Amino acid sequence: MPATEILNRADIVKAPQVRPQPQTEKPSLIGLLREDMAKLLVEKGVPERQVKMRVSQLWHWLYVRGVSDFDQMSNVSKDMREMLKEHFTVARPEIVEEQVSGDGTRKWLLRFPPRGAGRPVEIETVYIPEEGRGTLCISSQVGCTLTCSFCHTGTQKLVRNLTAEEILAQLLLARDRLGDFPERDTPQGAIVPAEGRKITNIVMMGMGEPLYNFDNVKTALLIASDGDGLSLSKRRITLSTSGIVPEIYRTGEEIGVMLAISLHAVNDELRDMLVPINKKYPLKELMEACRAYPGLSNARRITFEYVMLKDVNDSLQDAKELVKLLKGIPAKINLIPFNPWPGTNYQCSDWEQIEAFADFINQAGYASPIRTPRGRDILAACGQLKSESERMRKVDRLAFEAMMIANHGED
């Protein structure tokens, strides 16, 4: 199939021109817990007796109304707004590019300040609309340290952790762009849930390993689930980890969100190759941590993610060992057809084999949905994320277009 025909499968929408924010040392009020916001306000002269009220006002404007300009805070005095503008910011990150897949999936390339990285950094955030729900896939790091052999993000070296502000900014910006705040319009032709919120769920499944950035991820998710602000139910927030065992219990105890494990193999020999962190935290330790996860029940199951790699991990014997491995753990098993990317040596399992694998697991009593590939034409599918600052070589990109899907962006 000619590359031009493949390109027509996706509408690649350039983001509107957004002026980069000038370099500034102003701290952001986004991503601060209430007590930390209160301390900053007191330091800038807000009377103690007013602090609680001022924090409530700011919280409402930032997380209920979704404003990104202090001047929009109409019930805050002019003097207070001027003080806030002088000392703080609530600006959104720069949108470098917005791509819209033929299936309605949206991917944003966002640029953040260097903050120790030496130059501005870029990450990707993905929105996946489905009937009755809309899921936002959020990144926690710029790049990744884990080098999972089947994952495109793993080919990009870790640059730095994202701050709590930058993690939350992905959600705020997506809600801006989708018209998911009060008095905002949904883009014409956008595929979103017919009723209610445009973003109903968030998954920490973007770039990076969330549990290697525990404190910032914790703060961001506690704010996202705060009932007086963004108000996302913790049962609609899923954190995915490759298996950082010491932090798994803390995730349940201190954050309380749903847990997903990037499993992908049923024995240590294969998982050492696919997910190298397994050499440090082997399957026995990982399964023990899962069994001890706070709140684990049939109503709060752990999701195990399993990418289907042809002739690697997709045999019926693998399925039998998977059922044995998870025995006694309330679980759902997401089977993920492998999403190809330039330079990979893996292939996706045949569809008949994926269905046979799923049927065996289902008959053993586990829900085993096959994840429908979304956003492949804009490199937004599971395992395909990689920031534009790590652009693929032109020859790889052209080969990939000819092989399957649209390019990620012109050099």
UniProtKB/Swiss-Prot annotation:
Q: Provide the Radical SAM core domain boundaries.
A: 130-379
Q: Where in the cell is it found?
A: Cytoplasm
Q: Which SUPFAM superfamilies match?
A: Radical SAM enzymes
Q: Where is the active site?
A: E124 (proton acceptor), C382 (s-methylcysteine intermediate)
Q: Where does S-adenosyl-L-methionine bind?
A: G208, E209, S240, S262, L263, H264, N339
Which coenzymes or cofactors are required?
[4Fe-4S] cluster
Q: Which cysteines are joined by disulfide bonds?
A: C137-C382
Catalysis: reaction(s): adenosine(2503) in 23S rRNA + 2 reduced [2Fe-2S]-[ferredoxin] + 2 S-adenosyl-L-methionine = 2-methyladenosine(2503) in 23S rRNA + 5'-deoxyadenosine + L-methionine + 2 oxidized [2Fe-2S]-[ferredoxin] + S-adenosyl-L-homocysteine; adenosine(37) in tRNA + 2 reduced [2Fe-2S]-[ferredoxin] + 2 S-adenosyl-L-methionine = 2-methyladenosine(37) in tRNA + 5'-deoxyadenosine + L-methionine + 2 oxidized [2Fe-2S]-[ferredoxin] + S-adenosyl-L-homocysteine
- Give the EC number(s) under which this enzyme is classified: 2.1.1.192
One biological process term in Gene Ontology = rRNA base methylation
Which is one Gene Ontology cellular component term of this protein?
cytoplasm
Q: Which CDD domains match?
A: Radical_SAM (cd01335)
Q: Which UniProt keywords are listed?
A: 4Fe-4S, Cytoplasm, Disulfide bond, Iron, Iron-sulfur, Metal-binding, Methyltransferase, rRNA processing, S-adenosyl-L-methionine, Transferase, tRNA processing
A GO MF annotation of the entry reads: tRNA (adenine(37)-C2)-methyltransferase activity
What does the entry list as the binding residues for [4Fe-4S] cluster? C144, C148, C151
**Cofactor stoichiometry and binding remark:** Binds 1 [4Fe-4S] cluster. The cluster is coordinated with 3 cysteines and an exchangeable S-adenosyl-L-methionine.
**Tell me, what does this protein do in biology?**
Specifically methylates position 2 of adenine 2503 in 23S rRNA and position 2 of adenine 37 in tRNAs. m2A2503 modification seems to play a crucial role in the proofreading step occurring at the peptidyl transferase center and thus would serve to optimize ribosomal fidelity.
Further comment found in the protein's record: Reaction proceeds by a ping-pong mechanism involving intermediate methylation of a conserved cysteine residue.
Q: What family classification does the UniProt entry report for this protein?
A: Belongs to the radical SAM superfamily. RlmN family.
Protein name as catalogued: Dual-specificity RNA methyltransferase RlmN
Q: Which gene encodes it?
A: rlmN
